Swiss-Prot record:
It holds the Pfam family Pkinase. The modification Phosphothreonine is found at residue 183. ATP binds at residues 33-38, 55. Gene3D superfamilies: Phosphorylase Kinase, domain 1, Transferase(Phosphotransferase) domain 1. The keyword Amino-acid biosynthesis does not apply. This is Stress-activated protein kinase JNK-1. GO terms for cellular component: cytoplasm. It comes from Ancylostoma caninum (Dog hookworm). Its cofactor is Mg(2+).
Length: 376
């Protein structure tokens, strides 16, 4: 973008090969992450004097899928308010007209690391339990608002040095109503629930499976089910958890059931072998924080049949994590909108662009985007 076309209150910052057109309130940009969905920079908010993370969405209107994802991410970040879910601090675009609208910047709290980095650390039971508790609290809040995350993975969960945890990236999130009998979605394969792999309808428990995979990875230090492709992913799961019972297979579509039934049969590996005592830290001061308790919870989360998989509420009540629950403070409460309704259905890229632009204009009217005590 030429300097003459940079709007007032903005300036251009080259980050690698990307031109960031940023509000002047944000300085000291440095790249901290990049991927298919965009690039993320750390910066200093000169208005609040606090560190922030700024995400520039990558080509949000390249196609319908990108446009829908951008719309969902902005809407959910703006509406969901919970201490274990990353919050929206600000949002802006240098483009002033819908016809020119191509860039969206999202400003968030800056965290210290994601769980990919934490997995390499030696964590004691207190930290393992507390991280798991916070993941479940964040998911409970989303579910209470009728939202299934669908894309939980270590890179989408961020932490601070004091062990506080937040869930981010809602571009794939769907309402529970939308998810009923949905076709499989594109998401990181390793954390994909069996019912999704097999093309079944899915519900909130897809997130429980993903949390179980992440928890197991924190303990073992490596991915539990590193499938090379769709079929190999299923094989990796049954190699460890065993071939599911006939009652589960009977619920599959005929062609899928025939395929699964003709695969090699596996007996489940005992969880005492999968998660042996020597993989865990030494015992904690709290008698409930033991390898046996952690294994028991894992065995209830990593269940192929979603109807038999533990719910989020029951997982939060489990001895290994409920040590952190304070009923008097409502520490896992879900205050906020009772149900979030997302625009769905078939829309063109231009329609998604117009809807997101309208939401952003409304955000400008209700927030001090520039940090000068005025609305845009």
């Amino acid at each position: 973008m030429a300097s003459t076309s940079v709007p007032e209150n903005y300036y251009v910052v080259p980050i690698g090969e990307t031109q960031m057109v940023i509000l002047k309130r944000y300085e000291n940009l440095r790249l901290i992450g990049s991927g298919a969905q965009g690039i993320v920079c750390a910066a200093t908010d000169m208005v609040t004097n606090k560190p922030v993370a700024i995400k520039k969405l990558s080509r949000p209107f390249q196609n319908v899928t990108h446009a829908k994802r951008a719309y969902r991410e902005f809407i959910l970040m703006n509406l969901v308010n919970h201490k274990n879910i990353i919050g929206l601090l600000n949002a802006f675009s240098p483009q002033r007209e819908v016809e020119e609208f191509n860039d969206l910047y999202i400003v968030m709290e800056l965290m210290d690391a994601n769980l990919c980095q934490v997995i390499q650390m030696d964590l004691d039971h207190e930290r393992l339990s507390y991280l798991l508790y916070q993941m479940l609290c964040g998911i409970k809040h989303l579910h209470s608002a009728g939202i299934i995350h669908r894309d939980l993975k270590p890179s989408n969960i961020v932490v601070k040095s004091d062990c506080t945890l937040k869930i981010l990236d809602f571009g794939l999130a769907r309402t529970a109503v939308e998810a009923f009998m949905m076709t499989p979605y594109v998401v990181t394969r390793y954390y994909r629930a069996p019912e999704v792999i097999l093309g079944m309808g899915y519900g909130e428990n897809v997130d429980v499976w993903s949390v179980g995979c992440i928890f197991g990875e924190l303990i073992r230090g490596r991915v539990l089910f590193p499938g090379a492709d769709h079929i190999d992913q299923w094989t990796r799961i049954i190699e460890l958890l065993g071939t599911p019972e006939p009652q589960f297979l009977a619920r599959l579509q005929t062609t899928v059931r025939n395929y699964v039934e003709n695969r090699q049969k596996y007996q489940p590996v005992p969880f005492e072998t999968l998660f042996a005592d020597n993989m865990f830290p030494p015992g904690a001061d709290n008698a409930r924080l033991t390898a046996a308790k952690a294994r028991d919870l894992l065995s209830r989360m990593l269940v192929i049949d979603p109807e038999k998989r533990i719910s989020v509420d029951d997982a939060l009540a489990h001895e290994y994590v409920n040590v952190w629950y304070d009923a008097s403070r409502g520490s896992c409460s879900s205050a906020g909108p009772s149900t979030i309704l997302l625009v769905d259905g078939e829309h063109t890229v231009e329609e998604w662009r117009a809807m997101l632009f309208a939401e952003l204009q409304n955000y400008y009217r209700t927030h001090d985007v520039y940090g000068v005590g005025q609305r845009r």
